[in-house]
Curated annotation (Swiss-Prot):
It comes from Brassica napus. GO terms for biological process: carboxylic acid metabolic process; tricarboxylic acid cycle. This is Malate dehydrogenase, mitochondrial. Substrate binds at residues 109, 115, 147, 181. CDD domains: MDH_glyoxysomal_mitochondrial (cd01337). NAD(+) binds at residues 36-42, 62, 122, 145-147, 256. One of its GO terms (cellular component) is mitochondrial matrix. Its EC number is 1.1.1.37. It is found in: Mitochondrion matrix. It is an enzyme of class 1 (oxidoreductase). One of its GO terms (molecular function) is L-malate dehydrogenase (NAD+) activity. Belongs to the LDH/MDH superfamily. MDH type 1 family. The gene is MDH. Homodimer.
Length: 341
């Protein structure tokens, strides 16, 4: 009974996803590469991308254990062909021909650590991967998950500039987990179905640099000042909440993989010409004086088609934005400095 119900549920979900995208006969060939595919985020992300009907080729790369992940995921009877690549010598093969590269590589957060505590380790890892991307698939869209995103995205931009291959429309910091978390929290506070909720999250992707825009939430509900503060803080502290709940034995891997898959799906839809695909992301931006900023962007065949204006902000949000500017500015500068050492 359970198996038949699961099959029916899976079939229904797959048909729904196909309807939201394209019919199976019109879907272009798309290669997606995941760098860090054997890690805590990479493995569930690989599973979710294997289930995505927009993916025709799934390339899984890591420094170890990738063949096992590829063999396991490869048994799933969906469209994409899966190949696992392991070690520096195979990075080029993993990247060649990729339309979309997703990077969850790096060490996870542990209790008591901030995203910036991860900087020295993860920045070095990301720097090497970006150099390879610039060489082997310079025209791919790249989704950065590795923390601290506020710094790793500027590092990537500088590396691409040095290689003469920088296109600001193709570089994304994945902040979708912030949006996922705030939707869940808002739905609980506003007592509305979470599936109907949309709440933008702007500025950055590190603790206090995350600012939900409840004034633009749909469906709209009036939250008290205390509720705004509590829900904002819970969104900002979401990673810490998971790490503490896992008692030091893990970080937010499953929810991050889900969020990463959502944003990757949006990027693929944009590449395939689906109109009006809008998501929040940390990108090069001119809507504030900060060179990188998380806000709503319209995705298209070239990546970022438009960085949307912030729209009207409440007094609470205006105050929050002003308070966050110095912190996000310093993390951007930290990334630029590291890339140019």
């Amino acid at each position: 009974m359970f198996r038949s119900a699961l099959v029916r549920s899976s079939a229904s979900a797959k048909q729904s996803l196909l309807r939201r995208s394209f019919s199976s006969g019109s879907v272009p060939e798309r290669k997606v590469a995941i760098l860090g595919a054997a890690g805590g985020i990479g493995q569930p992300l690989a599973l979710l991308m294997k289930l995505n009907p927009l993916v025709s080729s799934l390339s899984l790369y890591d420094i170890a254990n990738t063949p096992g992940v590829a063999a396991d995921v490869g048994h799933i009877n969906t469209r994409s062909q899966v190949v696992g690549y392991m070690g520096d010598d195979n990075l080029a093969k993993a990247l060649e021909g990729a339309d979309l590269v997703i990077i969850p590589a790096g060490v996870p957060r542990k209790p008591g650590m901030t995203r910036d505590d991860l900087f020295n380790i993860n920045a070095g890892i990301v720097k090497n991967l970006w150099s390879a991307i610039a060489k082997y698939c310079p025209h791919a869209l790249v989704n950065m998950i590795s923390n601290p995103v506020n710094s790793t995205v500027p590092i990537a931009a500088e590396i691409f500039k040095k290689a003469g291959m920088y296109d600001e429309k193709k570089l994304f910091g994945v902040t979708t987990l912030d949006v996922v978390r705030v939707k869940t929290s808002y739905a609980g506070k506003a007592n509305v179905p979470v599936a109907e909720v949309n709440v933008p999250a702007i500025v950055g992707h590190a603790g206090v640099t995350i600012l939900p825009l409840f004034s633009q939430a749909t469906p709209q509900a009036i939250l008290s000042g205390d509720a705004l503060t509590v829900t904002t803080k819970r969104t900002q502290d979401g990673g810490t909440e998971v790490e503490e709940a896992k008692a030091g034995k893990g970080s937010a891997t499953l929810s991050m993989a889900y969020a990463g898959a959502l944003f990757a799906d949006a990027c693929l839809k944009g590449l395939n010409g689906v109109p009006d695909v809008v998501e929040c992301s940390y990108v090069q931006s001119t809507i504030t004086e900060l060179p990188f900023f998380a806000s709503k962007v319209r995705l298209g065949k070239n990546g970022v088609e438009e960085v949307l204006d912030l729209g009207p902000l409440s007094d609470f949000e205006k105050e929050g934005l002003e308070a966050l500017r110095p912190g996000i500015k310093s993390t951007i500068e930290k990334g630029v400095k590291f890339a140019n050492q």
